[in-house]
Amino acid sequence: MAKEFGRPQRVAQEMQKEIAIILQREIKDPRLGMMTTVSGVEMSRDLAYAKVFVTFLNDKDEDAVKAGIKALQEASGFIRSLLGKAMRLRIVPELTFFYDNSLVEGMRMSNLVTNVVKHDEERRVNPDDSKED
C-alpha cells in the first residue's frame, strides 16, 4: 500500500502554516501593505527547494502584486532563517515565491456561470420579450 502523504507533503503542509505566521507577525515591508495569504507550498522530493504560492488581498493592481512578490523574494533569506528556528529540519529549503491567481480565476469563472444562469432564467420566464425588440 502506497503512502498517501509522503514526507514532502507533510513538510509542505507544516511549512505553509509557519510561513503564514511569519508573514503575519514578522515581515514589516511596506510593499506588503496588502494582506498576504499563503495558498500552498510545493516541496521538492529532497526537501531542498520549496515553491510558495501566495495571494494578496486587493490584488487588482498588477504592479502591486509584482512589488509584493519582489518584496517576498528579497525577504526569503530572513523568512528562511525564521523557518529554521520554527521547524526542525536538517536543511531549510530555498524559498521561491509565486503569485497564485487560481482564486481570482475561480471567482471570475463563478461570476460567468452565475451570469449565464441568471440570463437563462430571465429568458425562460419571459420568452416573448426577446422577440419584441
Swiss-Prot record:
GO BP field: maturation of SSU-rRNA; ribosome biogenesis
Entry-linked Gene3D superfamilies: 3.30.300.20
Swiss-Prot/TrEMBL keywords: Cytoplasm, Ribosome biogenesis
Main location: cytoplasm
Keyword hit for Cytoplasm: yes
Subcellular location: Cytoplasm
Residue runs in coiled coils: none
Pfam families noted in UniProt: RBFA
Similarity annotation: Belongs to the RbfA family.
Physiological role: One of several proteins that assist in the late maturation steps of the functional core of the 30S ribosomal subunit. Associates with free 30S ribosomal subunits (but not with 30S subunits that are part of 70S ribosomes or polysomes). Required for efficient processing of 16S rRNA. May interact with the 5'-terminal helix region of 16S rRNA.
Quaternary structure note: Monomer. Binds 30S ribosomal subunits, but not 50S ribosomal subunits or 70S ribosomes.
Protein name, UniProt field: Ribosome-binding factor A
Taxonomic source organism: Salmonella typhimurium (strain LT2 / SGSC1412 / ATCC 700720)
